[in-house]
Amino acid sequence: MIQAHRFKAHKALNFDSWAEARTHGVTATEVANASTPAGFRNLVDSYGNPPEPYDNPYMAFGRKTEGPVSEWLKERFGIFPNEWLISHDNPIYMATPDGLSLDHTVISEIKTTGKDFGDKIPIGYRRQVQWQLYVTGAAYCVFTWMLRVETRTGEFQPGWIEPKTIKVLPSRDTIEGLIDVANRLWDIKQELLGKNGEK
């Protein structure tokens, strides 16, 4: 079980607190995005020049779909929706998986896509999930995706009756590489936090 002190902030209960807590560590999204040289540079640039918040129909469809898919995962696998930012024993390693079983041994991650992933999920998502597995200590992740199709009126709707899933196990080699990325990111974050504190 994940100890209570590792549940840092709840996204739905207090978004600002959740967002603030994320700045004091390195998240799964950050590690996944920074795992290539170009991605690392882009993410570091964004620390100094945060992009303006934006939204689009693809993101809106993803938010709309996540609720029903979360309920399906709860009924099918006993994985409950999660909004908690969770830390590793090392508190700078953080993640907010989309779902968490009651015994904390299984997590889920939900995506929507315009193209079926088939039997191999995209590398960026695999890295994100591996980091979530490392942070939570879960035995595996039920990676879940729903196809997005466009209607004649230009609206998006689910393309399947039920989502598809793949069971993802931890990969020690992948995780070790992600730890290195996270440590390098954290060094830079600390530098920036220190500079901001001096102002």
Question: Where are the model-predicted features located?
Answer:
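Short intrinsically disordered terminal tails
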Residues: 1-2, 193-199
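Charged, glycine-rich intrinsically disordered N-terminal tails and low-complexity linkers that flank
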Residues: 1-64, 68, 76
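Generic low-complexity, intrinsically disordered sequence content enriched
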Residues: 17, 47, 77, 104, ...
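Nucleic-acid nuclease catalytic cores
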Residues: 59, 77-190
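Short, well-ordered alpha-helical scaffold segments within catalytic/effector domains
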Residues: 66-70, 126-129
